[in-house]
């Protein structure tokens, strides 16, 4: 017996309407598509900079390529030679995040839980837009700390369309 794809058109329509229904810009909607490739590491620029909030680093990824591509919706942020990476807040799994040509996405990373009574120190952190990338290393001075970066239970927001939304997402998730 042959199974008909009765749900194919409604599902495709729902995915197409997702940006409209959620208010998300079309360039940001993360519906998986075989036609959109993972951004090549050389086609994206990653930055990390100091935030006005203590122990928070602002990161960004920009698509320098000529076509839309995807990165993982959870930035990969590691700290020196410590095991593990910053955990996403809110908790989320891997999924594609679309970046139009020339577009940027932003995230906020809290390196140190304010309630922490202990911490580790590292000389650098590494940021990548996708776990398949090696990432870019940023020294302590480039993220606004003197000498070392204090780390304990680090968290990161998902990629956001603006730095302000990344800051708001971190504030909401870490109250």
Regions flagged by a language model, labelled:
Residues 1-55, 83-92, 105-107, 111, ...:
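Membrane engagement elements in two modes
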Residues 58, 76, 124:
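Conserved beta-strand and immediately adjacent loop positions that scaffold enzyme active sites
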Residues 61, 71, 79, 127-129:
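Hydrophobic side chains in beta-strands
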Residues 66-86:
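Short acidic, flexible loop segments centered on an aromatic residue
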Residues 93-99:
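Beta-strand-rich interaction surfaces with strong enrichment in secreted/lumenal proteins
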């Amino acid at each position: 017996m042959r199974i008909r794809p009765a749900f194919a058109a409604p599902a495709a329509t729902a995915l197409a309407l997702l940006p409209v229904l959620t208010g998300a810009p079309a360039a940001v909607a993360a519906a998986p598509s075989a036609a959109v490739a993972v951004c090549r590491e050389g086609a994206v620029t990653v930055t990390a900079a100091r935030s006005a909030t203590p122990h928070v680093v602002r990161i960004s990824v920009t698509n320098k390529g000529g076509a839309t591509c995807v990165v993982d919706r959870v930035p990969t942020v590691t700290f020196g030679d410590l095991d593990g990476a910053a955990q996403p807040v809110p908790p989320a799994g891997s999924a594609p995040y679309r970046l139009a040509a020339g577009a940027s996405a932003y995230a906020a990373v809290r390196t140190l839980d304010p309630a922490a009574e202990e911490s580790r120190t590292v000389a650098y952190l590494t940021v990548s837009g996708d776990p398949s990338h090696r990432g870019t290393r940023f020294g302590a001075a480039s993220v606004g700390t003197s000498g070392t970066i204090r780390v304990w239970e680090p968290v990161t927001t998902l990629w956001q369309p603006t730095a302000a939304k990344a800051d708001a997402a971190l504030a909401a998730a870490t109250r």
